[in-house]
């Protein structure tokens, strides 16, 4: 039995010496054995100093050590640190959708991975938590080195099962554009997100600065909305403004969109509000179209700020809008992952939670109230 293992080890060394570096899954394919077996072989040979093991890949060391010798010590006598992540790195990324918002985020991540010589593998969960699980499993089976995850959490909050899945991952993971619950079990995971609380507050402060004191919020029911609402409510309270009821709206439901637009129209006509923040652009443009049909105009009758800024500039009256830094979030997630991979297996570097500030762009849809 041992002779078979030794023969396989020699074959592993022969392939890696010839190729220079390759992924564990590629090595398993050449040998005709499972990836689990190859990982075991690579770990044994790396401990002997005969190979260099990276996350999900293996390379030929500059100075391979003779059989039976352990890892080469540094000048201080301690074991040399793990090598940094390299061009062999493959990252998996799971997002709930590839609509505009997510497409830009993915593009930012893709460009950042490519700039480092790596590869990004994409999975789309279609807003289903069970599909998150399936995509993550597929990527782990494929031997990815790390995961960038934007889970389909209901209202932005993970269930116990979703938490347990993330805690059990055997590769590093970065949460993307998801807020880690305060004091929750996921606090040890790295995360990077747009600060939608600040984004919602920025919209209120802009309108209040123009003199508006009755500002409505129309928001979708998705993982981002609770944070936009939180920022809206905090800014309204800080400014001492009246707070009209928050309206939830589904832009994909024509009846719901019609009802929300009608409520906004009646609130303007009765002078209950003078301005509105609408999440997202699709909803905002749909509402504006209805208001125009019913005789209201922007910004003469009502001021409006859209939250998302993907197509807000294309409205008949270009909409002032808050833009989450989607591409920058994707780039930052990749940077965070490569830093984690470069620290080596078992490294005790503290986890990082990074939030990026959205940008408000002033266009033609806001003016002081009449």
Regions found by a protein language model. Name each.
Residues 180-182, 187-217, 255-265, 324-343:
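Hydrophobic alpha-helical segments within soluble ligand-binding/sensing domains
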Residues 114-124, 217, 233-257:
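Short beta-strand elements in bilobed, periplasmic/extracellular small-molecule ligand-binding domains
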Residues 4-7, 25, 43-48, 54, ...:
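Alpha-helical recognition/docking segments in bacterial nutrient-uptake
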Residues 92, 144-153, 216-219, 269-280, ...:
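Periplasmic-binding protein-like
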Residues 11, 101-115, 199-202, 223-242, ...:
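Short, solvent-exposed amphipathic alpha-helices that sit
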Residues 201-241, 350-365:
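An alpha-beta-alpha
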Residues 266-370:
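Flexible loop/turn connectors
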Residues 1-30, 64-85, 353:
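Extreme N-terminal segment that seeds HTH/winged-HTH DNA-binding domains in transcriptional regulators
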């Amino acid at each position: 039995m041992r002779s078979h293992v030794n023969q396989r080890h020699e074959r592993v060394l022969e392939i890696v010496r010839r190729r220079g570096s390759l992924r564990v899954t590629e090595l398993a394919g050449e040998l005709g054995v499972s990836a689990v077996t190859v990982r075991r072989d690579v770990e044994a040979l790396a401990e002997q100093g005969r190979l260099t093991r990276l996350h999900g890949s293996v390379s030929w060391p500059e100075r391979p050590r003779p059989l039976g010798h352990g890892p080469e010590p540094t000048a201080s006598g301690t074991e040399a640190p793990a090598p940094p992540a390299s061009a062999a790195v493959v990252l998996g990324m799971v997002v709930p959708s590839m609509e505009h918002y997510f497409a830009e985020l993915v593009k930012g991540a893709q460009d950042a991975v490519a700039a480092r010589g790596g590869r990004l593998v994409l999975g789309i969960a279609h807003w289903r938590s069970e599909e998150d699980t399936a995509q993550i499993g597929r990527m782990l089976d494929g031997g990815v080195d790390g995961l960038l995850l934007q889970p389909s959490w209901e209202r932005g909050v993970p269930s116990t099962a979703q938490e347990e899945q993330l805690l059990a991952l055997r590769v590093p993971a970065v949460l993307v554009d998801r807020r880690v619950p305060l004091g929750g079990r996921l606090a040890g995971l790295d995360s990077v997100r747009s600060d939608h609380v600040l984004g919602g507050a920025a919209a209120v402060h802009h309108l209040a600065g123009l003199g508006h004191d009755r500002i409505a919020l129309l928001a979708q029911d998705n993982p981002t909305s609770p944070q936009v609402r939180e920022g809206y409510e905090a800014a309204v309270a800080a400014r001492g403004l009246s707070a009209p009821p928050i309206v939830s709206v589904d832009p994909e439901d024509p009846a719901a969109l019609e009802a929300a637009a009608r409520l906004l129209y009646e609130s303007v006509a009765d002078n209950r509000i003078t301005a509105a923040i609408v999440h997202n652009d699709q909803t905002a443009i749909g509402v504006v179209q209805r208001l125009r049909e019913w005789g209201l105009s922007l910004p003469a009758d009502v001021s409006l700020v859209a939250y998302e800024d993907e197509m807000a500039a294309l409205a008949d009256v270009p909409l002032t809008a808050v833009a989450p830094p989607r591409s920058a979030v994707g780039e930052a997630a990749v940077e965070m992952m490569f830093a984690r991979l470069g620290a080596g297996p078992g490294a005790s570097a503290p986890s990082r939670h990074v939030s990026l500030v959205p940008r408000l762009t002033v266009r033609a849809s806001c003016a002081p109230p009449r």
